[in-house]
Amino acid sequence: MYKRQDLAWRTQYVGVFELEWNGVTFYFIDNEFYFGGNKPYSWIHEDIEKFAFFSKAALSALPVLGFRPDIIHCNDWQTGLIPVYLKERFSQGEFYQGIKSIMTIHNLKFQGIWDLKKVKDITGLPDEYFTSDKLEAYDDANYLKGGIVYADRVTTVSETYAEEIKTPFYGENLDGLMRARSNVLSGIVNGIDYDEYNPETDKRIYNNYNQVTFRKEKWKNKVALQKELGLTEDKGKFMIGLVSRLTDQKGLDLVAYVMDQLCAEDVQFVVLGTGEERYENMFRHYDWKYNDRVSANIYYSEDMSHKVYAACDAFLMPSLFEPCGLSQLMSLRYGTVPIVRETGGLKDTVEPYNEYEGKGTGFSFANYNAHEMLGIVNYAKDVYYNHKSCLLYTSDAADDLIGV
């Protein structure tokens, strides 16, 4: 199925592919000019036009398909124009009347910002849409801002992040707008696929285990990973994992500041991920310096990530900010205790251990401070070695951790 779509001064082909999978029908917008190639994203100036086309094409295709949704759920700046187009143009048609939109923000840092004059030309929107209370922001056009302004509801991926983005520190220059739209803003925490991340059936890990066999079987994954990565093979080592994009958002400046102290003789540190060159080289350096304790795997592998979740004793996420985070949920699923900074979804999903009440699913620290992080890592290590009867490292914990 195909049609033609006007985009400012040009007319573009719109193809629609249909797939039914597990009883759900999926529609895909096709256009080789915009979507040819092997990467979903390109340069920002190209993506600005690509996603303007996509937003308009998706709305235009609905009556052709005979599919009238009650709600259109938009995700991030790439679909930020859908609520704008829906109210500016499409809602005038009988077919579209009553359709509502929801705008979900996964990370407020990414907003789809480009030159205002060029965006006017690309989108075909009239001048009145490019004012400071609509799409204009600091003399540029901002797709995400448009979506937030025009959507009927706005959500983000955790309750704490929904509150944080109303403040200047986390608000990415949109905190005033988030406060203004707070009456329609909600935080809904992310989740993971419990079938995909299941230590009892996961074919990617070395040794399967469940709530009952947790104590007897999990450590075998540690020894197997030590062997594969060339680390000292010793089940008594306290193994910390870090699977992440290597960017400043992830709190890696804290790790860099105290890495020598983290690499104590009884600790092993396994890193998996790619990102900024300075962090990649930092971890490579410590891999060279402590080659029996540190393994820097500067690539990404789904198979290896599962092995790290299953093998480690603790999982480190000291993020500067974290809208939700999924890795802490994955580590919990494998009975690997998260050590996190209390921000965004990390605060919402990890209950800090209370030694007096014997409750908690992980360890946390509040301030963005390297020595505060180091202190909580050492506390987690002390609990691991000297308080084996505590909730976190017993098979009783498996009911809370693996059975999240």
Regions found by a protein language model. Name each.
Residues K3-L65, V189-N190, Y194-D202, N207-N208:
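A conserved catalytic-core segment of Leloir-type glycosyltransferases
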Residues D234-Q249:
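Conserved donor-binding/catalytic core segment of Leloir-type glycosyltransferases
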Residues F110, K120-K227, L231-E233:
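Donor nucleotide-sugar binding/catalytic pocket of nucleotide-sugar-dependent glycosyltransferases
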Residues V270-K307:
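Nucleotide-activated donor-binding/catalytic signature segment of Leloir-type glycosyltransferases, i.e.
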Residues M1-Q5, Y393-L401:
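Conserved small/polar residues in nucleotide/adenosyl-binding loops
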Residues K307-A310, A314-L391:
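Catalytic binding pocket for nucleotide-activated donors in carbohydrate/polymer assembly enzymes
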Residues I48-L125, E136-D140, R179:
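Conserved nucleotide-sugar donor-interacting segment of glycosyltransferase catalytic cores
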